[in-house]
């Protein structure tokens, strides 16, 4: 097992829990990356949010529920270290990583070895999972590229700033979750909101566009961004109003300091640690240089005197052309002893990466026992995401091929319902958005039922064997 990020940690845990001895290799702290700050397994380098925990209405919340059913270490650690975040599952990042580390170090079947794997694993390693993540070291990345004769794709993830809570001016800002939504561990007032007038917004956008950005290296200049983690200044470049329809949208919130005036835009900050002393700026990933960041972000009402625990940063992210290179069980077609997991495979997000680590671990455990394992049903979140990675996306409706892109879990990856719901329990017809809600709930219910059937048929039988 190479790489002790979220996917690698989850894969190692699944293998060990299945009775398979695991050697887990992690290059940190011997060799650090541009984004990591610690040597702890499962370090969160971007947001501290695992996004929505609503299993009935949201695809990522459904993925949470499926992973919990499968004994996920990552979800167990997240649940034990959650902080208030409205309808989302957010975690104390240090507590979360420490919990994962404690579990791995305490498992009798897991040996954690420090040191970099600088090329392909030795040929006598016959059951290997590579989960080295978006910042795979150059020697290993080049070895993989040489083996596959495929140029890895790459994009950037930008890191959002974190602010000390006690430096936020609450005479201008206020606590409220959008639409007062209450989530796991939350109260409905979990975000700090900073309002902007039209003039303030116009000035802010102009400053973002003019601010000095981080210089690219030659090999980074043509690297595309992933839309799910765009730097805020790149969003601003796409249109003056883009931010007002994205992370700064002023909907579902009322300023108690001036309740009769609707803000033109709103900046939200989300709790970042369990103590509640740190808050991250939601959606404010950035590649601005440090000086301009402080100057520009302190023009936000309520943040004039903000002290930053961490400023935003930028790192490159790489992933495989998985549908071409990997088989249905995440094995490299050119060398099937090597299996890949996590963000390298073209999934995007903490939960998605960990979930692919989970299924890779189950596949590797079945291989170690000399048995097979059928994939999870395509109707499940895990099966839908796996299907995207291993080729479900590759053809368009007209049969033309298109480039493989990283993907968050979403209901668009699921097979359609045989019969879409049209009526409420009382028999009246569903209208407008009610149909969308009912469809999502039906997809989620089908997914959990099908996953339970798959677990009963395959995993419990395997465990008994």
Curated annotation (Swiss-Prot):
Record's keyword terms, sorted:
Cytoplasm, FAD, Flavoprotein, Methyltransferase, NAD, NADP, Transferase, tRNA processing
- PROSITE patterns per record: GIDA_2
**Positions of FAD binding:** 3-8
- Where in or outside the cell? Cytoplasm
**GO molecular function, one example?**
flavin adenine dinucleotide binding
Catalytic activity field: uridine(54) in tRNA + (6R)-5,10-methylene-5,6,7,8-tetrahydrofolate + NADH + H(+) = 5-methyluridine(54) in tRNA + (6S)-5,6,7,8-tetrahydrofolate + NAD(+); uridine(54) in tRNA + (6R)-5,10-methylene-5,6,7,8-tetrahydrofolate + NADPH + H(+) = 5-methyluridine(54) in tRNA + (6S)-5,6,7,8-tetrahydrofolate + NADP(+)
Q: Name one GO cellular component term.
A: cytosol
User: Is the keyword NAD in the record?
Assistant: yes
Task: Give EC number(s), comma-separated.
Answer: 2.1.1.74
Q: State a single Pfam family of this protein.
A: GIDA
**Cofactor(s), names only, from the UniProt record:** FAD
Which BP terms in the Gene Ontology apply to this protein? tRNA methylation; tRNA wobble uridine modification
Family the entry assigns: Belongs to the MnmG family. TrmFO subfamily.
Q: What biological function has been recorded for the protein in this entry?
A: Catalyzes the folate-dependent formation of 5-methyl-uridine at position 54 (M-5-U54) in all tRNAs.
Entry's PANTHER family? GLUCOSE INHIBITED DIVISION PROTEIN A, METHYLENETETRAHYDROFOLATE--TRNA-(URACIL-5-)-METHYLTRANSFERASE TRMFO
What is the protein name given in its UniProt record?
Answer: Methylenetetrahydrofolate--tRNA-(uracil-5-)-methyltransferase TrmFO
Species source reads Bradyrhizobium sp. (strain BTAi1 / ATCC BAA-1182)
User: Organism classification, top ranks?
Assistant: Bacteria, Pseudomonadati, Pseudomonadota, Alphaproteobacteria, Hyphomicrobiales
């Amino acid at each position: 097992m190479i790489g002790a990020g979220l996917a690698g940690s989850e894969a190692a845990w699944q293998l060990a829990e299945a009775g398979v001895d695991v050697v887990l290799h992690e290059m940190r702290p011997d060799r650090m990356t541009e984004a990591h700050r610690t040597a702890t397994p499962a370090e969160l380098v971007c947001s501290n949010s695992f996004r929505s925990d609503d299993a009935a209405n949201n695809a990522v919340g459904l993925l949470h529920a499926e992973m919990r059913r499968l004994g996920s270490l990552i979800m167990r650690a997240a649940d034990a270290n959650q902080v208030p975040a409205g309808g989302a599952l957010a975690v104390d990042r240090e507590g979360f990583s420490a919990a994962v580390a404690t579990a791995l170090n305490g498992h009798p079947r897991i040996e954690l070895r420090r040191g970099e794997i600088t090329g392909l694993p030795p040929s006598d390693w016959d059951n290997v999972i590579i989960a080295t993540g978006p910042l795979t070291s150059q020697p290993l990345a080049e070895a993989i590229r040489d083996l596959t004769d495929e140029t890895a794709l790459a994009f950037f993830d930008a890191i959002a700033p974190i602010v000390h809570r006690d430096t936020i001016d609450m005479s201008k800002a206020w606590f409220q979750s959008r639409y007062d939504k209450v989530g796991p561990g939350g109260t409905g007032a979990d975000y700090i909101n900073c309002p902007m007038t039209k003039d303030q917004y116009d000035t802010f956008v102009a400053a973002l566009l003019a601010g000095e950005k981080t210089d690219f290296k030659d090999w980074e200049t043509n690297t595309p961004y992933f839309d799910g983690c765009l730097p805020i200044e790149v969003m601003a470049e796409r249109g003056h109003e883009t931010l007002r329809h994205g992370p700064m949208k002023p909907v579902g919130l009322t300023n108690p300091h001036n309740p009769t005036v609707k803000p033109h835009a709103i900046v939200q900050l989300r709790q970042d640690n369990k103590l509640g002393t740190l808050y991250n700026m939601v959606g404010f990933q950035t590649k601005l240089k440090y000086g301009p960041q402080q100057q520009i972000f302190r023009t936000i009402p309520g943040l004039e005197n903000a002290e930053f625990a961490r400023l935003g940063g930028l790192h490159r992210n790489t992933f495989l052309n998985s549908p071409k290179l990997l088989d249905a069980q995440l094995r490299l077609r050119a060398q099937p002893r090597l299996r890949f997991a996590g963000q390298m495979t073209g999934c995007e997000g903490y939960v998605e990466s960990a979930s692919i680590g989970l299924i890779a671990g189950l596949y590797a455990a079945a291989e170690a026992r000399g048995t097979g394992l059928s994939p999870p049903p395509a109707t499940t979140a895990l099966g839908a995401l796996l299907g995207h990675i291993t080729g479900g996306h590759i053809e368009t409706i007209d049969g033309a091929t298109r480039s493989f892109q990283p993907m968050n879990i979403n209901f668009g990856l699921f097979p359609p319902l045989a019969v879409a719901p049209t009526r409420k329990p009382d028999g009246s017809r569903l209208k407008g958005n009610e149909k969308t809600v009912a469809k999502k709930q039906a997809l989620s219910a089908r997914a959990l039922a099908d996953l339970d059937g798959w677990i009963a048929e395959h995993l419990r039988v395997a465990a008994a064997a």
